[in-house]
Each structure stands twice: as C-alpha cells, then as structure tokens.
Amino acid sequence: RFSEIESLITHIIEKLINSDDELINHFLIKENSLHVNLELIKKLSSFRHYEEERISEIVSKLKPLQRLRNSFIHGVWLDVTIENNETCIYCSDHRWQLTKSSSNRIQYSRYDSKRYTTRDLDKELITASEILLELKRLWQDIDEVNYF
C-alpha cells in the first residue's frame, strides 16, 4: 500500500508541476523522500489553487503513518510474541538517533524499537487503504484537469 501511495503522490505532483515534458517532472522529483513530496504536493496544490483542503487532509492523515512506513522499509522486525493475550511484534530501528536530554545535552543511541499489536497494524493499514482510495479519486479528478 505504501509504495502505491507514494507512486500516486508522485503522479499527482507531476501533474501539478504541469510541464510539457514528463521527463522534466520525473527529474525534478525522482530523488525526493516521502516527507519532501508531502511538503511539495501541499505547496503545489496551494500554488495551483487545486483541492488545497483535500490534499492538506490527505497529507495530515499520511504523516502519522510515516514511522510505520519507514519501519516496513528500514526496520528489523523481531519474532511475534504473545503479551497479555495480544499478538505483538517489535520493530527495531538501527539507525543513529539524536535526542536532547532534559539538561539539553545531545544523546546518541543506535537502537530504538516500537511495539506493534496486530490490532495496531490493522488500524494503520485501514487508514493507509483509506488514504490510497482518496489519492486514487484525486488522481482521477486531476487527470482530467487542464490548468491552461
């Protein structure tokens, strides 16, 4: 779902850029992270006065899912466990994390983990599916739009 969401966001951005040459669109955004593309789609929709509220709502729903998306791509998923009658799985992130302590000292750590229950994952995936459906509707609408 996440790759399809990112693909649709890219297509919508390309349409909002509205270049005569599709390759120019591609070169402008091909290296962008999801975070950069979310900011860009908001700016472009505002600039084009196209579905600003709708796009802003999609972005605000998608931002909380970024950690889960990053976990799927970069995370180290551990074995499934049962805790308090719930099926759980932990995902570790082995990238360096920088945090500030209460005394404003920067602390470094390499390992961060997040606990997910199957219920948590189901809920997140339902949200991702809803976002995907909204992006598909938006793509259908924008594909018929002519700005000039």
Predicted feature locations:
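Conserved N-terminal beta-strand and adjoining loop/helix that marks the start
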Residues: 1-2
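N-terminal signal-anchor transmembrane alpha helix
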Residues: 6-10
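Acidic, Ser/Thr/Gly/Pro-rich intrinsically disordered interaction regions
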Residues: 11-148
